Amino acid sequence: MHDASALSNLEEILQIAARIGKVWRQKRAELTFDEKSIGQFASNADLEIEHYVRGALAQAFPGQAIIGEEMGGALSDDQTGWAIDPIDGTSNFILGLPIWAISIGYVVRGDSVLGALSVPDLDLTLSAKTGSGLRLNGVPVQAIPPPAAVKVIALGENDFEPGLRTDEIAQGLRAQNYAVVRYRCAVFSLAMSALGRLSGYVENGCGLWDIAAAGIICQEAGMDVTSNMIAPGRYAIDARWPAETSA
């Protein structure tokens, strides 16, 4: 699971998943979707991508537990297995915005150890495993932190954290001299952070599939990442570049 071929396999799986997503982007009129909760959607594109990724993972890594945002499942008893987000930012995807991403991460006892994500409309694939450093489109790269003077942080919102509480978090970040942006896509925001295009990302109440890949990717890029379960199936994450992390 932790050899070099695992990342290559994930990158290949993501390339095909991204192509599926791009095909759906070209036929948006055929998209159908349901609102799972306020502001949270699942489309037929989500389901097709997750179905493909599950099958590809089962073939490449047989016998491993799999959990996905749309099709459910469970990790093993010791919280080990794959976590899939077929389309993070589904509302953006439905609207035709380029801010959406696909994520596949492997966790061991709840900790992210290996993962890859794709931002298809930007032709970006990021991947990492513990101790390996960051890979961009399959090539090892050295991440460049953002300028310390340009403090822009992304904030996530979801159906778990009340809007007023999220606004309070935003106010706290502004008090630390951050400009706060909200892209409604955790995986995209964490990818941009890992590439040094944001100072970081904060969200309370995201799913494991949102951070299973991006968590280890941000760590291997050189960021400080803290995450913990705050309710069953819900996580808090704070990922920032070291110079930007408050004490």
What is the predicted role of each segment?
Residues M1-I87:
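N-terminal subdomain of lithium-sensitive/metallo-dependent phosphomonoesterases centered on the IMPase/IPPase/PAP
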Residues I20-W24, D46, L57, T90, ...:
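Residue-level signal for inorganic ion chemistry
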Residues L47, E70, P86-G89, P120, ...:
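Generic detector of well-ordered alpha-helical packing
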Residues Q64-A65, G81-W82, L114, V152, ...:
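Structural motif
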Residues S76-R135:
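DPxDG-like acidic metal-binding loop motif
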Residues L136-A143:
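A structural micro-motif at secondary-structure boundaries
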Residues P145-A247:
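An extended, acidic
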